[in-house]
Amino acid sequence: MRISIENVTNILNANRVGSRNAEIDWILTDSRSLCFAEETLFFALKSKRNDGHKYIPELYDRGVRNFVVSDLPKELEHYSDANFLQLANPLKGLQRLAEKYRARFDVPVVGITGSNGKTVVKEWLYQLLSPERIITRSPRSYNSQIGVPLSVWLMTERTELGIFEAGISEMGEMEALQSIIRPSIGILTNIGGAHQENFYSVTDKCMEKLALFKECDVVIYDADNEMISGCVSKSLFGAREIAWSRKDDDRPLYIEWIKKGEKTTTIRYRYLGMPNEYTIPFIDDASVENSLHCLAVALYMMLP
């Protein structure tokens, strides 16, 4: 779904230098990933270790003519047929553009967060659901402040379901990711020690992750984890909960038993009172937990 450079300029409220007509199909933050130069908009992002502005000459020589920058090139006359959209923070611009792009789509979107298991759950869900739907999902582990906008930009008019990861490393980061992903189905995989140094407590980290689900229709999590259950209660979601449990048979998804063999695990469950079972080719606890998250989504979406 193309977007004109004029529309991009307006969305970003940027200072535009250049008058070249352009239609944007691709956004880029890594010069090594360039594919279709004429249709690409490059965001020159700055970090502690790198500065995207230094790749502008190379990308220009390779055919890119549209750039989002905080600093204009010193030899601007060398780029007379290029567009430069200047704004104070290109990263915020990238997120803003992705947020507006996401708003074009009225399809179910699964948002996955947690300390571990995000990518596995995403890939398993893709395998479970893709025979029935055209799915856009995060590439690899694209779950950061940069990766999430790039992932959402992959949605097209053919997308019927989105599955995106969201990862955070400090307080306040989830708000931007939520506004980009805007999930209707939320999964909290678990809460562990990753990036704990940037949070006051594990509870604070859990509450920050749950901010991804503030507009969800349904939220899926492990009800046997008392800390997670307590945080969900504090969050006062208006969403329906599909909390799975091995202990509480009043939960929507009750796990009756789990039997592990040498190479497989069989799980017996009841969903809304209806019993069934399935077998996975894994015996580790993490895989069992990941499979239960996937099961809950499949049941919610009424798959057999």
Enumerate the language-model features and the residues they cover.
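N-terminal leader/targeting and accessory segments in enzymes
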Residues: 1-96, 256, 283
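Structural signal for conserved beta-strand scaffold positions within catalytic alpha/beta enzyme cores
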Residues: 29, 44, 69, 86-87, ...
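Thr-Gly-centered strand-to-loop micro-motif
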Residues: 43-46, 137-139, 164-165, 280-281, ...
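Residues that form or flank phosphate/diphosphate-binding pockets in enzymes
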Residues: 37, 50-54, 120, 146, ...
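ATP-dependent carboxylate-amine ligase
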Residues: 1-16, 36-41, 136, 210, ...
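Acidic, Mg2+-coordinating active-site environments of NTP-dependent enzymes
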Residues: 73-79, 187-304
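Conserved beta-strand segments of alpha/beta enzyme cores
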Residues: 15, 83, 134, 240-242, ...
